[in-house]
Amino acid sequence: MKKVLFFNLQMFAEAVSGKKLVYLYRILDEAATVDGTTLAFTTENSRTKSKDADATETKDGTIRTPGAAEVEITATSILSKGDTLIDKLEEAMDSDKVVEIWEANLDEPVTGEGITNKFKGRYYQGYITEFEKTSNAEDFVECSLTFGINGVGIKGDVTVTTEQQELASYVFADTTKTGA
């Protein structure tokens, strides 16, 4: 009889920080001229997948028939002075334009010869279904967006340039002169 060894994978697991899962956006009409970019001062992102199921009663019990999966992505950020992306996204909602969305996990770089700035991720296309700009006397202006996704998206390797990573969060900077 062969002895089977089991490992507790949690001993080797490492949690992914929320700051390392970034979302980039672009209006599909601008794909030829504009790179995807992050929202400035993002405080929260969320991706929800749901599926309704119809129930059919039989003599032997209920049979469930699943429907199509629905995907929704939300983003919340603090409004940055001069932010053009928020304006573009609001205009895209008003004009029913398709928005491209990339979800990239900066903790999972793709490795290989000649591969740089690629990370495991997902690609989506959809419409903005809700846009909210909230301002009160004590806090910064907050923008919340909800995207209704066409289909369920697709896994792939997402290019996130160093500049885009810097926009998403601080990236290590060395002590040497930058040339600026």
Set out the residue ranges of the language-model regions.
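Glycine-rich loops and low-complexity Gly/Arg-rich segments
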Residues: S50, V98-E103, I149-K155, Y170-D174
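Intrinsically disordered, low-complexity acidic/polar segments
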Residues: G82-T84, I154-D157
